[in-house]
């Protein structure tokens, strides 16, 4: 990445890339997988069979995702440290910080978290598209005497993925911790009487394409409501997991979601980078951002009456480089005319 660009803008570029890649898998990759699922052999405009397309996508995406995390870890995070912006790992928490985090866990996390033990009476839960989850290895018996062995912890979507530590607990700068670190640290408190042998984050991307025939739809609103709900639980198209996840757990998740190695991405960092966009609101460092851009207004549209400007000829606005305000003024004046 170009180092002359502001640091936080480079971070945002990486995060926007993640968001775009999510949508690519939800729609484009899902479309190719659907064609394979139903045995459609038709090739696309590029004369490539869906299986060939998917193989090529996997090859390229694995390379660029690896590069993305390498840039994040070896460049962006290191430069943020130099700028006194810290993502504090669990093993670096002080006693005071640990006490504060534990209180946050008890007051904010515990009331809204719902771990699910995996046993014959608790099958694998339905996990929402792109949600952060943890697969946990357990040893021992739960409060009901059951040997669970494994559990799933869905991270509460109502909680922020980044939490800022109080300034009085730190030695200056901006100090942030991941919600995933909090859940990792205190996961054992969610399973009384059992020992947590391992806790690993993962995320499933699902088919979010909406497919229906407009000519056959009688109630468009109800159809859209149904399609929007089903987007959360469509067929899995990608598995992302912490690279430290044991192979046995990876294979368990692959089997559960009917995915193979080509659809699995082992990452060295947070599995949902888009949630790091909260950094914009948590870190007030304008020196690490682009200067705010103020869109201009063409000279003829600066007057009080937009209709006078239009009578003199057509006016072209180039959004976002020029302000949208004249359009709003036009509607407001037309409503009063």
Residue ranges and their predicted role:
Residues 1-337:
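N-terminal localization/anchoring segments of enzymes in phospholipid and broader phosphate metabolism
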């Amino acid at each position: 990445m170009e180092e002359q660009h502001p640091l936080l803008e480079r971070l945002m570029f990486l995060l926007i890339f993640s968001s775009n890649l999510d949508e690519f898998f939800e729609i484009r990759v899902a479309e190719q997988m659907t064609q394979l699922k139903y045995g459609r052999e038709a090739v696309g405009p590029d004369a490539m069979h869906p299986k060939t397309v998917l193989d090529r996508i996997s090859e390229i995406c694995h390379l660029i995702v690896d590069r993305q995390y390498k840039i994040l870890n070896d460049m962006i995070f290191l430069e943020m440290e130099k700028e006194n912006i810290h993502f504090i790992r669990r093993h670096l928490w002080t006693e005071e910080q640990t006490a504060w985090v534990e209180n946050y866990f008890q007051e904010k996390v515990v009331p809204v978290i719902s771990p699910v033990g995996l046993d014959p009476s608790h099958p694998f839960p339905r996990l929402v598209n792109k949600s952060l989850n943890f697969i946990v290895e357990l040893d021992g018996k739960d409060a009901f005497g059951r040997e669970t062995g494994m559990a799933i912890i869905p991270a509460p979507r109502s909680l922020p993925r980044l939490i800022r530590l109080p300034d009085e607990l730190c030695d200056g700068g901006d100090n942030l911790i991941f919600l995933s670190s909090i859940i990792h640290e205190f996961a054992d408190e969610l399973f009384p009487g059992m020992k947590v042998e391992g806790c690993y984050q993962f995320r499933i991307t699902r088919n979010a394409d909406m497919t229906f025939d407009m000519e056959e739809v009688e109630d468009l609103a109800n159809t859209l409501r149904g399609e929007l709900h089903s987007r959360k639980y469509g067929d899995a198209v990608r598995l992302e997991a912490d690279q430290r996840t044991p192979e046995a757990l990876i294979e368990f998740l692959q089997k559960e979601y009917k995915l193979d190695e080509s659809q699995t991405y082992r990452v060295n960092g947070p599995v949902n980078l888009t949630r790091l966009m909260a950094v914009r609101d948590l870190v007030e460092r304008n020196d690490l951002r682009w200067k705010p851009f103020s869109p201009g207004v063409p000279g003829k549209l600066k007057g009080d009456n937009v209709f006078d400007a239009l009578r003199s000829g057509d006016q072209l606005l180039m959004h976002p480089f020029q302000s949208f305000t004249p359009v709003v003024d036009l509607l407001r004046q037309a409503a009063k005319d």
